[in-house]
């Protein structure tokens, strides 16, 4: 479970911003929505609000970039650069400074802190700590690219791993690839227990989950679709062979069609045929019709694949992060998804959901605690984005019945400044 993520010098984020999933003990409302990790109460859901281009996506992208760099570090060639690193552009001094990422998390009952700093050429700093008690214990530290510090009882063994590492690779990944027990579980948290999604990634992973779905997932998916008033009573799912001539006739360029055929032959590419079953009343009575999923609304597609993803997360104590979760979804559907994470019968493993949105229709203290609501605001005069929580405001301007109205009135910032008085239509 994620406790905290911090980043700096990434895209519009110049100075360090922190997203905390640790519940504020002074917020007493909806304590039954919290999940427990050791001695800490954690949020199961966090929402990030803000205007368009305020930087909401950038903090989520920072997490995505860090996770990608960790997962694929060991595949990086010695001469490969780190093009994913994107420093703040509107200050020339920041171009020469590293981008920083820091995670605090709990995995398999242990609390860890892992972070690194990198530019587009190499890893500048890196560290991993484990909390055996209330204070962190060093597993390793790395400074100035290749200056390592290890506990005395691990120094000889860890130095052997360090000799196998390169300046553009993360020691966490390199040591794990050589079966280092101390780094394996922290690495596996990044490999398996946290993911950042946009719609295409939801669709891609959802397809794989549905392809392997057991009866329990199928029943859960259909019940959710029915409860959400989609009038879908079933679905069919087929994996189709890739036939080049069919792809060419559909208008796909020959080269791409041939590439898909080769991928399918090698077990990498697949075509899926999914249809949703509807019951429609006709003059002759009720009839069953099947509609290809791609002809359903984007919201139907998103909920179809998204529910599969969420169910899998709830079975595996996963933290899922979704950019613009509300896109294409009715607010009531989004509320239902959020409430799934609060439901202890459904969310038995304490899965977490973090998402960005600018849909204020469900911005309410009936659906969120104060410490679950974050705002991202951009100062366009200098190009910097900052992140802060509704919980940072004193109690007086935060009333249970007017959070949405107060936000629209600008009391919490993070709204667009619109001036159309001189506009000629």
Predicted regions and their residues:
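Electropositive, glycine-dotted interaction segments
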Residues: 113-252
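Switch/communication elements of ASCE P-loop NTPase nucleotide-binding domains
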Residues: 1-38, 42-71, 281-415
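Short proline/glycine-enriched turn/loop segments at secondary-structure junctions
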Residues: 160, 263-264, 363-364
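Short acidic/polar mixed-charge low-complexity motifs
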Residues: 13-15, 108-112, 122, 134-136, ...
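Extended helical coiled-coil dimerization/tether regions that scaffold
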Residues: 8, 203-295, 411-412, 416-423
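An exposure/low-complexity boundary signal
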Residues: 60-98, 168-225, 339-353, 358-362
């Amino acid at each position: 479970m994620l406790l905290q993520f911090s980043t700096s010098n990434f895209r519009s984020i110049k100075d360090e911003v922190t997203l905390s999933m640790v519940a504020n003990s002074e917020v007493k409302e909806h304590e039954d929505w919290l999940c427990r990790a050791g001695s800490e109460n954690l949020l199961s859901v966090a929402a990030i609000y803000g205007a368009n281009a305020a930087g909401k996506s950038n903090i989520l992208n920072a997490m995505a970039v860090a996770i990608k760099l960790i997962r694929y570090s060991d595949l990086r060639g010695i001469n490969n650069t780190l093009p994913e690193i994107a420093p703040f552009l509107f200050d020339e001094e920041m171009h020469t400074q590293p981008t920083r990422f820091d995670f605090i998390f709990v995995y398999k009952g242990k609390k860890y802190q892992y972070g690194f700093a990198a530019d587009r050429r190499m890893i500048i700093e890196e560290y991993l700590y484990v909390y055996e008690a209330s204070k962190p214990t060093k597993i390793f530290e790395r400074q100035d690219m290749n200056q390592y510090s290890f506990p005395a009882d691990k120094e000889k063994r860890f130095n052997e791993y360090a000799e196998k590492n390169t300046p553009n690779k993360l020691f966490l990944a390199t040591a794990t690839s050589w079966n280092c027990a101390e780094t394996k579980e922290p690495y596996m948290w990044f490999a398996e227990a946290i993911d950042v999604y946009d719609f295409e990634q939801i669709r891609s992973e959802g397809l794989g989950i549905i392809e392997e779905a057991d009866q329990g997932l199928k029943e859960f998916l259909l019940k959710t679709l029915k409860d959400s008033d989609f009038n879908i009573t079933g679905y069919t799912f087929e994996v189709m062979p890739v036939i080049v001539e069919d792809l060419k006739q559909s208008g796909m360029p020959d080269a791409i069609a041939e590439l898909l055929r080769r991928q399918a032959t090698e077990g990498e590419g697949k075509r899926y045929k999914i249809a949703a079953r509807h019951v429609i009343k006709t003059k002759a009575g009720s009839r069953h019709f099947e509609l290809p999923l791609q002809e359903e609304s984007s919201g139907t597609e998103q909920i179809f694949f998204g529910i599969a993803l969420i169910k899998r997360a709830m079975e595996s104590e996963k933290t899922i992060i979704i950019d613009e979760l509300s896109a294409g979804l009715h607010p009531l559907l989004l509320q239902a998804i959020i409430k799934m994470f609060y439901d202890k019968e459904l969310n038995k493993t304490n899965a977490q959901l973090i998402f960005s949105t600018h849909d204020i229709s469900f911005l309410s203290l009936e659906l969120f605690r104060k410490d679950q609501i974050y705002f991202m605001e951009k100062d366009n005069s200098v190009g910097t984005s900052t992140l802060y929580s509704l919980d940072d405001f004193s109690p007086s301007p935060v009333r249970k019945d007017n959070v949405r109205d107060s936000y629209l009135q600008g009391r919490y910032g993070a709204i667009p400044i619109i001036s159309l008085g001189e506009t000629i239509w």
